From Swiss-Prot:
Protein's name in the database: Large ribosomal subunit protein bL9
SUPFAM superfamilies: L9 N-domain-like (SSF55658), Ribosomal protein L9 C-domain (SSF55653)
Family, as annotated: Belongs to the bacterial ribosomal protein bL9 family.
GO BP: any one term: translation
Keywords, comma-separated and alphabetical: Ribonucleoprotein, Ribosomal protein, RNA-binding, rRNA-binding
Pfam families given in the database record: Ribosomal_L9_C, Ribosomal_L9_N
Length: 150
């Protein structure tokens, strides 16, 4: 299926690109998420009319993400959990816990923006976690897990 991208999509293209993707990917993900439209003649004409507005909105989102990124740069988030004598946690620290900790510090971040390549944190100590504020902006933060002894 031929689609017009309405925003940058990883491994696919940028705003305004006409690309061919599998029907299911377009129908079930890109179109419902508002990231693309079918590449028909009427949609192409409509897109060209709205192109400047879409580019302006994209630039605003990017500027907002950069402003948040400068505040998040070098930030350390502390989370305390019950832990055993060996430093292993009873449970784990997930992206939901990190989002909650960021919200208490005044940052509004979506759960899907917190990227944990090694999975949930299960040890006491410091860990690096990436926060993807925009498709172009990824900020590393430090999560310090403090163990509460029983």
């Amino acid at each position: 299926m031929q689609i017009i991208l309405l925003e940058k999509v990883a491994n696919l293209g940028v705003l305004g690109d006409v690309v061919k993707v599998k029907d299911g990917y377009a129908r079930n993900y890109l179109i419902p998420q508002g990231k693309a439209k079918r590449a028909t003649q009427s949609n192409m004409a409509q897109f060209e009319a709205l192109r400047a507005e879409l580019e302006r909105a994209h630039a605003e989102k990017l500027a907002e993400a950069q402003a948040i990124a400068t505040k998040l740069e070098g930030l350390m988030v502390q989370i305390s959990r019950k832990a055993g004598m060996d430093g292993r946690l009873f449970g784990s620290v997930s992206n939901i816990d990190i989002v909650d900790a960021l919200e208490t510090q005044g940052f509004k971040v979506e759960r899907s923006a917190v990227r944990m390549p090694e999975g949930p944190i299960k040890q006491v100590g410091d860990s690096q976690v990436d926060v993807a504020l925009h498709s172009d902006i990824v900020v590393p933060i430090t999560v310090s897990v403090l163990g509460e002894q029983q």
